[in-house]
């Protein structure tokens, strides 16, 4: 079965984040912006009025907490590298509605990864029509333009986060 937060599934990647700071945030404030765990330290530094180190990849989302009309990240990037046949290594991006995942299925010399490779594959989910991610629509014609667009964004996100270990393959 699945355990941990290893797979790029909504049940794993969606996490509540609760913060109490009455001086700045009204009680009951809710925000549905896309965030990544690397943004949390940047937020805490922002509230502590400490300059974010240049090498820190995360961004403070303080302004998003105060104004839900502001737009945050268009995508979140995810990478799982500890490959095994039942939990293949993969990376992907998620927008507010869609998710594109590539299972590259190779251990890439990682110490704790299983050496047995798995066939590479793609998955694409429309989280509005399929919130439980039960129907992979990667091969459906009506989604192809969006998949091509998200594929280009996946390449950009990997580069931005300096994840160069395995390239994003062409869509197949």
What positions do the PLM features span?
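Intrinsically disordered, low-complexity polar regions and short flexible loop motifs
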Residues: 130
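Short acidic-hydrophobic sequence patches enriched in Asp/Glu that either
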Residues: 7-13, 33-36, 53, 57, ...
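A glycine-rich phosphate-binding loop feature that marks nucleotide/adenosyl-phosphate handling sites
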Residues: 170-171
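Active-site rim elements
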Residues: 4, 24-34, 47-52, 84-87, ...
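C-terminal cap/loop subdomain of S1 sulfatases and analogous C-terminal strand-loop tails that border
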Residues: 38-41, 46-123, 127, 145, ...
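Conserved beta-strand positions that form and line the central face of beta-propeller blades
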Residues: 7-8, 17, 30, 60-63, ...
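Histidine-centered active-site microenvironments of extracellular/periplasmic hydrolases
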Residues: 1-29, 36
């Amino acid at each position: 079965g699945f355990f941990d937060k290893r797979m790029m599934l909504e049940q794993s990647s969606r996490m509540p984040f609760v913060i109490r700071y009455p001086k700045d945030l009204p009680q009951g404030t809710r925000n549905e912006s896309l965030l990544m765990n690397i943004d949390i330290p940047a937020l805490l530094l922002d509230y502590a009025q400490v300059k974010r180190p240049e090498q820190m990849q995360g961004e403070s989302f303080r302004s998003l907490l105060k104004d839900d009309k502001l737009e945050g990240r268009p995508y979140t990037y995810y990478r799982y590298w500890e490959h095994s046949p039942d939990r293949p290594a993969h990376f992907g991006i998620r927008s507010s509605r869609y998710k594109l995942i590539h299972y590259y299925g190779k251990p890439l010399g990682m110490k704790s990864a299983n050496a047995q490779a798995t066939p590479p594959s793609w998955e694409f989910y429309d989280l509005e029509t399929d919130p439980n991610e039960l129907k992979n629509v990667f091969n459906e014609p009506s989604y192809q333009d969006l998949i091509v667009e998200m594929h280009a964004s996946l390449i950009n996100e990997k580069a931005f986060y300096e994840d160069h270990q395995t390239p994003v393959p062409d869509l197949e």
